[in-house]
Amino acid sequence: YDIESLNAGNVQYESVRKLKQELLQKAYEGFLENVYGRVDSRADDFEAFYRKEAAWLNDYCVFRLLMEREGGSQVWQNWPEDFRSKEKAIEILAEEEMVSGSSDLDKKLRYYAYVQWVAKSQWKEIANYAASKDISLMGDIPIGVSLYSVDVWANVEIFDLDWYGGAPPEKLFKDDEFVQKWGQNWGIPLYRWDVLKERHYDWWRQRIGKATEIFGMFRVDHALGFYRIYAFPWNPMRNEEFLPLTKVEAEELCDGNLPGFKPRPDDSDEDKAANRAEGEVYLSMIKQSAGLAEMIAEDLGMVPD
């Protein structure tokens, strides 16, 4: 690799990603050969991390392994049918390992855990150094996550895959005809807040808890979306298809649905009150989950009355 060339000009993402992956793989092999399974504090640290983070880490490792098998594609809805379900995928991988009698599968899964361990260790070093200088790090919590993420794949029951968050039409976007006509379609699945409520908002609490292990403060992106969020009844991959359509034509393709505010617009005092009450519950839950960390709400957009 020509490191000087990689450091010059714009970031060459694919080349840099390939180089980092090769270096991380070599580091992992060295870790297994010289550290893992021996009396070494680093081996103990890794095992402790592996156990402590199991609630999310195990799913992540399986997701990354399946991505690798699918040529790096994270579009899990296009994977073989058995891999689209977390439970079925784990069952198949377990059967593979049993039949082969090899530990290669476990080794591959632990590679992805190793990379996360390295990243978390580096973040902790940065946070500790910042704290020694009386500096608090600030993180960012987007309101949504990508459809093609381990979060959605592993927790599909808490996401509404029929609706995608975004923003209303904006005439100031002169160079974007779609945004002027329909709005911004961010492609983030909406939450099934009723399901999350039954689970005591476990996914959100874990998300905030992990962020505050490093950050002393964090920005909540699009806080207004917790009260009501503009949503689309189609995936943004279909935006071009909908661009030339009339509202009537779009409705026909979406079972009578059109983009609009969810769970309801602020069209009446009753709806406004309901949206406000629900939003306060969700943001209060996030604030409570943050403990001593400071929460900063970003309110860009159409602020309700």
Feature roles, as predicted:
Residues 1-120, 144-305:
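Alpha-amylase-like alpha-glycosidases and glucanotransferases acting on alpha-linked glucans and related
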Residues 140:
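Ligand-binding beta-strand-loop-alpha-helix segment within the catalytic cores
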Residues 119-132, 136:
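Active-site pocket-lining segments that scaffold enzyme catalytic pockets across diverse folds
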